[in-house]
Amino acid sequence: GDTPSHMVMPAIHYSKEDVADLFESYTKQPEEPVITKEVKTSRRVMRPKFLSAEMGVSGANVAVAETGTVITMTNEGNGRMVATLPKTHLYIFGIEKFVAKMSDIRYIFKVLPRNGTAQNITAYLSFYTGATKVVTDPENDTKEDKNFHMIILDTPERRKIMASEDYKDIFCCIRCAACLNVCPAFRLVGGHVYGGSIYTGGIGTLLTSLARSQTYIGRWGTCSGSCSMATASWRAALAAPRADSPLLV
């Protein structure tokens, strides 16, 4: 499969013609390169899968240590269907997603939609705190407790980053992609060239290299122009890691 080219809009490199070809290869039916029709095709194919799924898997934009609440911000209804329709709901996120108190989330709510999609708030703002009820028999309105689980990625690599005076601010990144949108190198070559296997752009190269694999760290030196535009857009943008950094040894 393909890899994301942008943090907020991972498939932005696909044209409507590309999407039509992709849908045709999957559905084996003709597809016009018209966005409204492609949306209907996507809904027709995906809706039965949502309704029949036994488990939904979500990622968190924010997690609140005070209450155990996980929060997802999205403009797509499928995010809420994944969380509410299946009997089992699994959240997977890193420890860097935690804030201490519920009152702290307002800062992320203010910045993330504005920087990511130029909105005051996303269309869907979902809070999940523990297990809820799920309808298991619609005809009789029978409900059972949902299975709710969280996998929190607390890895040695993440701990090293958090303990580092040089690079701990990298976890201030909320994946809004503001730095990508102003980056001359990213706009020229795209996220498949400038970025890691998971996250894109300069900040994505750092995140992937420090938290998972150093394979992509060379792309920073190749693409970074040290123009400071990313730093101006968001304080989490950092200078290139030194070759002798203990995190890269």
Where are these regions (language model features)?
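The feature marks the mature, well-folded catalytic cores of soluble enzymes
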Residues: 1-165
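Ferredoxin-type iron-sulfur electron-transfer modules in oxidoreductases and energy-metabolism complexes
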Residues: 138-170, 180-181, 186-249
